[in-house]
């Protein structure tokens, strides 16, 4: 049996950030993931300058040999009506490919890594957690996304009782013919809101790569909404006529609608495993990074790994992201005051789509980069 101070399950942005943050803590850390890296990852894939700053990533250095698409404009509309385009002037976000971004973050981790290793068992034994009958630690951190096996240890775990966002998307490298037929521009992601405001679709070009997808909180209608959106985008020339391959599905919880416990004795959840995606946009990368850094701060200071000692992590999450709603409302993307028929007019407004939808809901420009002492 190999002993560690903590085991991190999941080597995505949350897990790799936590491992890196604990590098000089003196703790022996193991990070486990079911896949090898680099690996395919379904995600629209954009990160704000705040994320780059928090992770100390130099955009110029990162862009060498990797896709990094500067974003200066957004094109936003409601399905079935004309879009509004806003120019923000400066670079307000970056497009990345998750297969590259996640591999880059993991490459900066110097702790032991056990990749291509599915977690088949997690057993409590003498105050420690034993994973796959091979590795043992007093603390296990779930960073494995929505269906993280560690999340099953807390509360009711992942399941049908949760109100999840279901998304389908595809990302592919365009041929020269496809690229010339695609009106979507790299520096201008397109966001298209469903008319019932229970989701939105996107068209995001990153150099020669194109990402198209749609996410909703009622997945039984997801395929129909997606097919209608794709046909509309094809008919207007926003995307090429010939799309390769199948759309891939994934799921996640919005912060205000999630009810997962964040800690228990010897257990913590971070990132999508904890249900931290921003409620208005569904973005999970920044909450994943920040939750990992907040967790590292608590782990570094904790005298033991009891639930009471780890509860300060839950308090820090509430302080950073707000208190979760006790009764989740029925709307997904938007507050109650933005409802039809008002929404149709608001989505035609340059001020609203720029100041509220883009800068507040999607870019979170009013929230400064996280500063923690780890």
Give the positions of each predicted feature.
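N-terminal FAD cofactor-binding segment of flavoenzymes
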Residues: 36-75
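Predominantly flavin-linked oxidoreductase catalytic cores and closely associated redox partners
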Residues: 11, 21, 107-239, 275
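FAD/FMN-dependent oxidoreductases across multiple families
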Residues: 118-121, 218-295
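Beta1/beta-strand and adjacent pyrophosphate-binding region of the FAD-binding site
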Residues: 1-12
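Glycine-rich FAD pyrophosphate-binding loop
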Residues: 7, 20-43
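N-terminal Rossmann-fold NAD(P) dinucleotide-binding loop
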Residues: 15-16
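C-terminal helical "tail/cap" subdomain of flavin- and related membrane-associated enzymes
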Residues: 297-374
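Dinucleotide-binding Rossmann-like beta1-alpha1 core, especially the glycine-rich loop
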Residues: 47, 53, 79-101
């Amino acid at each position: 049996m190999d002993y560690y101070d903590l085991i991190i399950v999941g080597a995505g942005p949350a897990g790799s950030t936590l491992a890196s943050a604990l590098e000089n803590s003196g703790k022996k850390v193991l990070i486990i993931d079911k896949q090898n890296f680099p690996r395919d990852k379904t995600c629209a894939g954009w990160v704000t300058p705040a994320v780059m700053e928090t992770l100390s990533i130099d955009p110029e250095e990162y862009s060498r040999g990797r896709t990094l698409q500067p974003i200066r404009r957004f094109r936003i509309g409601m399905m079935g009506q004309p879009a509004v385009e806003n120019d923000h002037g400066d670079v307000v976000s970056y497009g990345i490919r998750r297969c590259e971004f996640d591999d880059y973050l993991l490459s900066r981790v110097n702790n032991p890594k056990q990749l291509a290793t599915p977690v088949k068992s997690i057993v409590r034994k003498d105050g420690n957690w034993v994973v796959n009958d091979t590795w043992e630690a007093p603390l296990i951190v779930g960073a494995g996304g929505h269906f993280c096996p560690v999340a099953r240890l807390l509360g009711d775990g992942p399941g049908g009782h949760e109100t999840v966002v279901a998304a389908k998307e595809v990302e592919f490298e365009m041929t020269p013919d496809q690229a010339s037929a695609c009106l979507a521009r790299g520096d201008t992601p397109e966001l298209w809101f469903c008319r019932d405001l229970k989701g939105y679709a996107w068209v995001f070009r990153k150099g020669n790569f194109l990402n198209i997808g749609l996410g909703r909180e009622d997945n039984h209608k997801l395929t129909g909404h997606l097919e209608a959106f794709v046909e509309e985008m094809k008919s207007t020339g926003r995307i090429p006529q010939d799309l390769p391959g199948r759309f891939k599905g994934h799921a996640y919880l919005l912060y205000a609608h999630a009810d997962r416990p964040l800690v228990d004795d010897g257990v913590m959840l971070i990132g999508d495993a904890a249900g931290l995606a921003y409620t208005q946009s569904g973005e999970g990368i920044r909450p994943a990074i920040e939750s990992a850094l907040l967790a590292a701060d608590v782990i570094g200071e904790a005298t033991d790994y009891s639930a009471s000692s780890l509860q300060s992590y839950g308090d820090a999450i509430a302080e950073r992201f707000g208190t979760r709603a006790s009764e989740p409302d029925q709307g997904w993307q938007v507050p109650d005051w933005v409802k039809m028929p008002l929404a149709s007019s608001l989505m035609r407004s340059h001020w609203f789509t720029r100041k509220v939808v883009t800068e507040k809901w999607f870019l979170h420009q009013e929230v400064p980069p996280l500063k923690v002492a780890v």
